[in-house]
Each structure stands twice: as structure tokens, then as C-alpha cells.
């Protein structure tokens, strides 16, 4: 991990810990999860919102006013709204994507769930996704949520990451292995 990325992850982790603990104490984890999913969707959909949280050209005051308006409009839970306001005042809104990931991980852990990052050459059908989740759940002993992405460059097969474990059954990796074996022989 690069130094700026690890600094961002550290900042996001501290905010995530505080937000999670406050939400857990007030039994508001479901509301927090809804709010972070809404915020993540807004970040994915809005170039203006991404620019707002990352641009050094936007002043603290403008960031604070804009993020407050966005939080109010979206109806985010108070603990997240207040944290975003504090982050804007300290010019730390750039860590919001990492904060969302950290909060999702904490909520899933509290529920005994784990998220599997799955990369496939074509989009998985609902049936395939459910079957994969069931198979992975049997292997890891927890409820598994699939976060699927499509990458045509893997040609076929799957790349599955659950926690620190990775299973790469993609055709690309098999071709690379074959290529390396041929280099050793010839």
C-alpha cells in the first residue's frame, strides 16, 4: 500500500471506529448501513460530489456547507452527518470512500458476515451469484455477500477474494502460468 493510501486508510479507520461504536450503542446499525449505501450510490453517480470531496480548490467552508446540504437532503443518520461535517472542517472528506468501505466491513463483521470480491469475465447471473455465495459460506463458515465486478481481460473463470484469501481460476492466470512454464523449459 502506498504511503498516502495507508494514511487515508488510517484516517478513515479512526472515523469508522467512532461512527460504528456510536451507532452500535444506539442500536442504529441498520440505519447507518442504509445511509452509507445511499452515500456510496451518490458518490458513484455524481461527479460533482466526487469533485467536492477531493478537490483542494474547494474551501473548507464550501465543503462544509455542501456536505451538510447533501446529508440533509439524503436524510443521513445524525452520527454520519456530524462526522462528515467534522471531516469537512478538517479537510478530510477525501477519505469518504475508504470510510464507507471500513464501515461496511465493521457492520458485516458485527453480523457475522463476510464480503467476497468476485471478478468475472461476464456478469454473474443471480443464480450463479447465489450458488457461489452458498459454496463460499460453507467454506468460511459465515454468511457471504458477493460484490461482483466484470473484467473482460480475465477471459473466463473467476477471481474470488474473501478476506486475505484469493482463489484465481481465471483463464488469464492459467495462460500466464503456462507461459512461465514454457519459459522455464525452453
Curated annotation (Swiss-Prot):
* Subcellular localization(s) per the UniProt record: Cell inner membrane
Cross-referenced Gene3D superfamilies, in alphabetical order?
N-terminal domain of the delta subunit of the F1F0-ATP synthase
Q: What does this protein do?
A: F(1)F(0) ATP synthase produces ATP from ADP in the presence of a proton or sodium gradient. F-type ATPases consist of two structural domains, F(1) containing the extramembraneous catalytic core and F(0) containing the membrane proton channel, linked together by a central stalk and a peripheral stalk. During catalysis, ATP synthesis in the catalytic domain of F(1) is coupled via a rotary mechanism of the central stalk subunits to proton translocation. This protein is part of the stalk that links CF(0) to CF(1). It either transmits conformational changes from CF(0) to CF(1) or is implicated in proton conduction.
Key words, A-Z: ATP synthesis, Cell inner membrane, Cell membrane, CF(1), Hydrogen ion transport, Ion transport, Membrane, Transport
Gene that produces this protein: atpH
Q: Which NCBIfam families match?
A: ATP_synt_delta, PRK05758.2-2, PRK05758.3-2
Give the membrane topology: Peripheral membrane protein
Q: Which GO terms describe its molecular function?
A: proton-transporting ATP synthase activity, rotational mechanism
Domain of life per record? Bacteria
PANTHER family from the xrefs?
A: ATP SYNTHASE DELTA CHAIN
On assembly, the entry states: F-type ATPases have 2 components, F(1) - the catalytic core - and F(0) - the membrane proton channel. F(1) has five subunits: alpha(3), beta(3), gamma(1), delta(1), epsilon(1). F(0) has three main subunits: a(1), b(2) and c(10-14). The alpha and beta chains form an alternating ring which encloses part of the gamma chain. F(1) is attached to F(0) by a central stalk formed by the gamma and epsilon chains, while a peripheral stalk is formed by the delta and b chains.
Reply yes or no: does the keyword Calcium apply: no
State what protein this is by name: ATP synthase subunit delta
Amino acid at each position: 500500500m502506498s504511503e498516502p493510501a495507508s494514511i487515508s486508510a488510517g484516517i478513515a479507520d479512526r472515523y469508522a471506529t467512532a461512527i460504528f461504536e456510536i451507532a452500535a450503542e444506539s442500536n442504529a446499525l441498520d440505519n447507518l448501513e442504509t445511509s452509507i449505501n445511499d452515500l456510496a450510490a451518490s458518490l458513484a453517480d455524481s461527479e460533482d460530489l466526487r469533485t467536492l470531496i477531493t478537490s483542494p480548490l474547494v474551501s473548507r467552508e464550501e465543503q462544509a456547507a455542501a456536505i451538510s446540504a447533501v446529508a440533509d437532503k439524503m436524510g443521513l443518520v445524525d452520527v454520519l452527518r456530524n462526522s462528515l461535517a467534522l471531516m469537512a472542517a478538517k479537510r478530510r472528506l477525501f477519505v469518504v470512500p475508504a470510510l464507507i468501505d471500513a464501515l461496511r466491513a465493521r457492520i458485516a463483521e458485527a453480523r457475522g458476515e463476510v464480503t467476497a470480491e468476485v471478478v468475472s469475465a461476464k456478469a454473474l447471473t443471480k443464480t450463479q451469484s447465489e450458488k457461489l455465495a452458498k459454496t463460499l459460506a460453507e467454506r468460511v463458515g459465515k454468511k457471504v455477500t458477493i460484490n461482483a465486478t466484470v473484467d473482460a481481460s480475465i477471459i473466463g473463470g473467476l477471481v474470488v477474494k474473501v478476506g486475505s484469501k484469493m482463489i484465481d481460476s481465471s483463464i488469464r492466470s492459467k495462460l500466464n502460468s503456462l507461459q512461465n512454464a514454457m519459459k522455464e523449459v525452453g
